[in-house]
């Protein structure tokens, strides 16, 4: 066994040309997509920095959980990038994960069928689905073992996109996918 330290989760901050930092609440984004200091109108550079109260760039996980749910926040943290690397918090990422989770819920509402996915298939979409599912199980298993959660989640998203194209879902495949996604 080995101990793994998670990388630091950072946040966006803003700095002037002279490299001094500006608290987030004193910054506005304008129509041109750039960031400006409200008081002076000076254009600022968006940088990645350690979260701090003085910069007011601290993300309160309770607020994120309230908005998107604990499952979305937890999955986003695993999806942000390699576990041991530092990475910036971006609420837009949670929104994307939350949408994917809603897509999984929508798929769960579809009717199940008893098609034998291990046998010979005629339907091209089912053949592709079976192939993608096999790739998903293989990749998620390997990536979970090596703590590469971000790439495991990415592969599950690929499978969810394929699964959403189906009118009904093979029961055995859905049952197995629920087991694969449940730790995440």
What kind of region is each of these model predictions?
Residues 15-70, 84-95:
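Conserved phosphate-binding loops in nucleotide/dinucleotide-binding enzymes
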Residues 5-15, 182:
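Short, conserved secondary-structure transition motifs
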Residues 1, 62-184:
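Helix-rich, typically C-terminal accessory recognition domains appended to large enzymatic cores
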Residues 3-5, 48:
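A structural signal for short, well-ordered beta-strand segments
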